From Swiss-Prot:
Protein name per the record: M-poneritoxin-Ng1f
Known tissue expression: Expressed by the venom gland.
Major subcellular site: secreted
Family: Belongs to the non-disulfide-bridged peptide (NDBP) superfamily. Medium-length antimicrobial peptide (group 3) family. Ponericin-W subfamily.
GO cellular component: extracellular region; membrane; other organism cell membrane
Annotated organism of origin: Neoponera goeldii (Ponerine ant)
Length: 20
């Protein structure tokens, strides 16, 4: 559960990069 949340948190910067 915690590992999944950590994975999502790590993916956030990549998603933000797509919008920039």
């Amino acid at each position: 559960f915690i590992g999944t949340a950590l994975g999502i948190a790590s993916a956030i910067p990549a998603i933000v990069k797509l919008f920039k």
